[in-house]
Amino acid sequence: MDISRSKFFRLASAALLAGWCTTVWAQGTITLHGASQFNDEHPFTKGLMKFEELVKKYYGKPVNFVLHKNSELGLEKDYFAYMNQGISVDYAIVSPAHMSTFAKAAPFIDAPFVFRDHDQMNKVIAQGVLNPIADEIAKKADVLLLGYGGGGVRSIFATKAFSDMAGIKNLKIRVQGAPIWTRTFKAAGMAPTVIAYSEVYNGIQTGVIEAGENEAAGVEQMKFYEVGPNLMQTRHAISIRPICFSGKTLRRLPADLQAAIRKAAAEAGDWERQLESSSDTSILDKLQKEGKLKLVPFNERDKMRESMMPVLSEYAKEIGAEAIFAKINAIK
């Protein structure tokens, strides 16, 4: 499909939605629009549906939700831009990588080896360690991080199998757009490149790249196993995916609905995180049993971590995230 034409129709649809939402509110019927890149089976979509369910429960009055799935309104970076502008998308789950324009420290909380395990990550969230980043994003982007989903463990999938650091040398791998991902993967000896998430499949198929990295749910949903049938269990990152809400939208809503949204988002984030973290192994085992994916133990994970940690520490200094990184490391 012609990319410019596709983008035109997507933006046109978003513009129409923005006008329609305003009209509905003016008539007194509140309708909120959400967006997900994935279908009903993905944990992100399920998390947003849980959010909607909880809002209705806590608000106790009529409120309508329209959740646009399967990238109908673009990708996560588009959702964040729409929420920043107060149009088209009121709520979505978005990768911190797409928030770096407004807060340099945002992608750091989703970087490789920042969290030791799920227990540490859950404590970081519960203790409010990430609040300074959320506050900066709210101030500069007017997008509120009201809950924290994620919990998926990211590993490398590729056209070839390997089990040690020698195998990843010069590996042409797609990484997320935040600079910390390029720097850490280069430090480990790989050849990272940034391309759109929606182009990863074609990128491997055409030989532009030979690998990517993702959580189990993403590998299954995007069918990356078809082009990268070997999944090396590097377990190099645990994802954090905030449930975001447009500040411009929230301020236009009744106070009791605002309170319900805040409470529901926090609970839905915890719920989605548990769902995603608990389904990782079962998804990968299922794909392997079906002959779609080969799980390959990675024997030098500690060496990979050691190669990346100096870059993480230096980057934390550059972006003013030293205090946050220190607090994360202090949590056992």
Question: Where on the chain are the PLM-derived regions?
Answer:
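N-terminal secretory/targeting leader peptides
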Residues: 2-3, 9-13, 18, 27-121, ...
